[in-house]
Amino acid sequence: RGETKLAGVIEAAIRVTVRMHPNRLAIIGGRRTVLSGVYRRAFAERSIAVRQRIAQPLSGLIENGDTHSSRLREECRKILLPIRTCSHVLLACTHYPAILSELRHFVSTGTTIIDPSDEIVNQIAHWRLPAGGKQTFLSSGDTEKMKHAAFNAFGVRLAKITRVDI
């Protein structure tokens, strides 16, 4: 049996952001992510000051398939208004790429929105994975809700999700 490899979204987000040399970095993320300070501390170690905004309402809307409503746009406006002129906005939640086109309406044209998912794809592309592997989906939450949320937000049907305790 081969080794299990993991790609962490937080580490990927930090790597890609540092390479961009932001002069005014903002982070939007879920409540627990923002309050944990994980990004703030990591960027402080690299002498990058950040402004953080809790964007929790967006996750629930996206999970319910709402990616373009007036309610979603109003939440985006409220969340992004105080940080709209930052040079870079880091998406610190895997839900937010589903509404990237909406988010762009509420930041200045000079603001770069950072989606760390491409960094993860690039990292995994360098792994020498055997052919014929399988996908495994894990969730610490409700697996049925995750199935519905994946379909609603991204149009992806997940066959089996295993619940794990962390």
Residue ranges and their predicted role:
Residues R1-I166:
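Non-catalytic structural scaffold of enzyme domains
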